[in-house]
Structures are given as structure tokens and as C-alpha cells.
């Protein structure tokens, strides 16, 4: 069936309405991909948005629910399951794990990061980093219903740490 993805600042209720409209038109939708506004984007939409130490606008990478759009994420994903939808969230992980993100503390403890309060670079090429990332950052989202991830990589083409390694594999 149909996959839906659009870069738009949808709320959970707007997505429910959208799926209802598709169903009323007999559009056989199977997959709902929620673009980046599921997470906090802070000043991302400003013309002169501040950049982080990785050269990305603050809010480009994110792992903290934007509660004004998704006040009850688990409830939303439960609804998606009742609608037989597979769901994905958009990721732009170039800025690693920032200290202001909800999963930061879990991640740094699992990874063994010793520079507390400092961002942890994106190091998917490192097994220990990848394990901590999947267990403590992505895992909690999957437990509430995220089926898969849309890695929307738009930064540098190769790893800054492993020669010739594509960031999208």
C-alpha cells in the first residue's frame, strides 16, 4: 500500500485526521513516516538559527518529543497499530547526542562517556557507540511502537572517523 511522508509540522491529531481522510478515499495506506517535527527543533526554523559544534542548526538532530505536537506518543503509536500502520520517525543524527536531549543521561552511562555535559559525536562506526545508541536512544521509541527509522542523512558523505565509510552504509 501507500507510504505517507511529508515535511510538515503535523500534530498527532492532524496525522489521525489525515489517515482518516485517506481511508475515506479508499487509499490503501500501510506506512506513516513522521518527519522531523516529532522532536524538539528549538530555533531551527529561524533564518539565522544557531549552529552546534558539528556545524548543524540546533534542532536538526533531536530525540526529545515535541510535546505540544505529540503529548502522548505511546497513545499515538497504539492508535497507529489499531489502524494497521507501520510507523517510522525521521532522523538527522549528525549532531550526535546533545546534553539537552531526553536520552542523554542513559546514553552516556551506557556508552561510558566521561565528558559529562558535553555532546557525544555521532560514531555509528564504533560498536560500543552503536550498541548504546540502539539500546538507550532508539530502543525506548521502539518499545512504544516505532517500527523503523528513516535515516535522512544530508550532511557529510563519509564518516569523519572511519575512512571511506558512508554514513548511510
What does each model-found stretch correspond to?
Residues 1-12, 29:
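An acidic-aromatic substrate-binding cleft motif
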Residues 28-169:
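Aromatic- and carboxylate-enriched substrate-binding clefts and catalytic-loop regions
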